[in-house]
């Protein structure tokens, strides 16, 4: 398999709290668990990472995937002996993952519980949940990195010195689809439904940036919903009344995404759809939403999709699925892309560990911000991990794709 910088394509460790025998002596100003002269959560033989993510509730599917993917990656790495760090020590990677049910208060509580025993927080899903402890992590100088939120604040070093996002920003995604639509040269009327928070606002901002000044694109109507809403039928009904031929649906809640697709069909409104990368799963959303009824469903991606015929037999995908089954007890092809994303996060962390010269959070952050053109496993051609550009997450390039009834394929044009 083609990999850069000799990363192992294999998987992880414990899903929830792991009992760890700590070695070495912690510094007086650090919590227990530090290596000699190092930071909390790292010894001469182990490094412990913390994750707070939804493992129950409406976003449990994606949240469970955030743990499974990184667990799968480091499972294989640990089985092979661990990661050789830049300080010459070989360490195994352990994790403590707690359920926040997509509740910001629970996420903050989880962070407070974990911060004294982990080296860094990573991979957690959600904008409101990650925001809930961002300021505390800065104050405590605990890295909160490679998190699954497209909120650009996590990639701005002046505002978030201890943070870095992993997935493309919401603005990146919305702009990519807008550019494709403008490039069609055909007139399009667009209906917009967005989540009434930073998530939805980011997608709409990127989309409007791309269509600014384009004479062929008209926004017919724009509505919002709350992340706590249990139905968006009223909004879909209003938007259907516009007769728009494109539906831009900036939605993060899986049940609502399915219901939106279903409701539009009940109203006999069949526009082309745009869905965000985290709510565009063929198996979990498009199939139950009967998305094949629409002339086109578009999303963006930077990862290979195991269900797609285009990647049947792909070595990255084959190894990934094997690791998921063996090390994460996840036997089926994942319904959510978060499994692939967190697998990539594992590979990125391995690269960072290999280049950090001291067992400290400071050395970790320095190494983290110097990853360039890393071809992590499962990345689509044309994408890479690059952490050197301030204001951008680790992955900032996306490929617009179109649903073909089974999976996605690259959309060269709209239509």
Predicted features along the sequence, with ranges:
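Bacterial signal peptide processing site
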Residues: 26-28
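Extracytoplasmic ligand/sensor domains, especially the bilobed periplasmic-binding protein
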Residues: 105, 118-223, 274-299
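Extracellular/periplasmic bilobal clamshell ligand-binding domains
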Residues: 232, 344-415
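C-terminal motif of bacterial Sec signal peptides marking the signal peptidase cleavage site
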Residues: 21-24
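Extracellular/periplasmic ligand-binding modules, especially the Venus flytrap/periplasmic-binding
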Residues: 205-206, 253-257, 306-371
């Amino acid at each position: 398999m083609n990999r850069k910088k000799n990363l192992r394509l294999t998987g992880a460790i414990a899903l929830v709290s792991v009992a760890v025998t700590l070695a070495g002596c912690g510094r007086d100003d650090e919590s227990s668990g530090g290596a000699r002269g190092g930071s909390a959560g790292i010894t001469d033989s182990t490094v412990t990472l913390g994750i707070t993510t939804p493992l129950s509730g409406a976003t449990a599917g994606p949240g469970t995937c955030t743990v499974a993917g990184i667990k799968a990656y480091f499972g294989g790495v640990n089985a092979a002996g661990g990661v050789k760090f830049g300080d010459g020590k070989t360490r195994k990677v352990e994790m403590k993952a707690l359920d926040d049910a997509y509740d910001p208060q629970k996420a903050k509580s989880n962070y407070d519980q974990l911060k004294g025993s982990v080296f860094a927080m990573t991979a957690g899903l959600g904008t409101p949940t990650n925001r809930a402890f961002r300021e505390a992590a800065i104050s405590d100088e605990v890295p909160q990195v490679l998190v699954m939120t497209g909120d650009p604040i996590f990639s701005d070093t002046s505002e978030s010195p201890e943070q870095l996002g992993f997935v493309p920003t919401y603005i990146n995604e919305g702009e990519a689809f807008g550019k494709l639509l403008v490039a069609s040269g055909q007139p399009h009327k667009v209906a917009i439904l967005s989540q009434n928070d930073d998530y939805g606002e980011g997608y709409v901002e990127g989309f409007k940036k791309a269509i600014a000044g384009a004479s062929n694109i008209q926004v017919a109507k724009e509505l919002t919903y709350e992340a706590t809403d249990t139905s968006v039928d009223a909004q879909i009904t209003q938007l259907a009344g516009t007769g728009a031929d494109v539906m831009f649906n900036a939605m993060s809640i899986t049940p609502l995404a399915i219901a939106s697709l279903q409701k539009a069909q009940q109203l006999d409104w069949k526009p082309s759809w745009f869905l965000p990368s985290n709510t565009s799963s063929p198996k979990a959303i498009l199939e139950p939403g009967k998305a094949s009824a629409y002339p086109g469903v578009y999303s963006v991606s930077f990862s290979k999709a195991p269900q797609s015929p285009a990647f049947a037999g792909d070595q990255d995908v084959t190894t990934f699925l094997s690791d998921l089954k063996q090390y994460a007890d996840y036997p089926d092809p994942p319904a959510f892309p978060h499994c692939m994303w967190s697998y990539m996060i594992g590979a990125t962390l391995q690269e960072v560990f290999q280049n950090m010269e001291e067992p400290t959070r400071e050395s970790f952050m320095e190494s983290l911000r110097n990853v360039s053109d890393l071809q992590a496993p499962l990345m689509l051609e044309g994408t890479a991990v690059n952490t050197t550009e301030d204001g951008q997450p680790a992955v900032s390039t996306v490929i617009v794709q179109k649903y073909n009834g089974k999976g996605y394929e690259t959309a060269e044009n709209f239509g």
